[in-house]
Amino acid sequence: MTDNFLSNSSQKQGRLSAWLTIHRLSHRPLGFDYQGVEIVEVRPEDWPSVAVSLYVYGFNYLRLQCGYDVFPGGPLASIYYLTKVQDGADQPEEVCIKIFVSRDNPKIPSAFWIWKSADFQERESYDMLGIIYESHPHLKRILMPESWLGWPLRKDYITPDFFELQDAY
């Protein structure tokens, strides 16, 4: 399943990226963050198989899921920080998975069925950015009212001229 998606990367391949390559899981290494955590890009269609493989490999804790708008009119990103929690591990192994989607069709398979802690985090990304997490059992707004129009954290979002403050007193 590794195709030219992996070969198009000029980044140094880390330990986890090498493991994903050995197991023929499509990905692209993006280097390391400032703390030395390996960053890997995965396509939305490859995310379910990569997520299950990472869980089986030992990444049993979803530390963080968030999303962001890369640039106005550009793609949206969903990020998953996974940790391998083990007994007596003072330096647990971590990985950052980035998934980029088009703002015209922002669909990513949900990680809820693997890491239950993805529930509220994916809902927040949906509420603020409009990323649709397919097969998520409770995908609805979590911070904004259900009647709210648009996605407030998108860079092309236009703030409404008027909105009603409810329960302000």
Curated annotation (Swiss-Prot):
The record gives the membrane topology as: Peripheral membrane protein
**Where is this protein found?**
Plastid, Chloroplast thylakoid membrane
Q: Which cysteines are joined by disulfide bonds?
A: none
PROSITE patterns the UniProt entry points to? COMPLEX1_30K
Instruction: Read off the SUPFAM superfamilies from this record.
Output: Nqo5-like
The alphabetical list of record keywords is: Chloroplast, Membrane, NAD, NADP, Plastid, Plastoquinone, Quinone, Thylakoid, Translocase, Transport
Q: Name one GO molecular function term.
A: quinone binding
Reaction catalysed by this enzyme: a plastoquinone + NADH + (n+1) H(+)(in) = a plastoquinol + NAD(+) + n H(+)(out); a plastoquinone + NADPH + (n+1) H(+)(in) = a plastoquinol + NADP(+) + n H(+)(out)
- Pfam families the record matches: Complex1_30kDa (PF00329)
Extract the coiled-coil ranges from the record: none
HAMAP family tied to this protein: NDH1_NuoC
Which NCBIfam families does the UniProt record give? PRK12494.1
**What protein name applies here?**
NAD(P)H-quinone oxidoreductase subunit J, chloroplastic
Species this protein is from = Staurastrum punctulatum (Green alga)
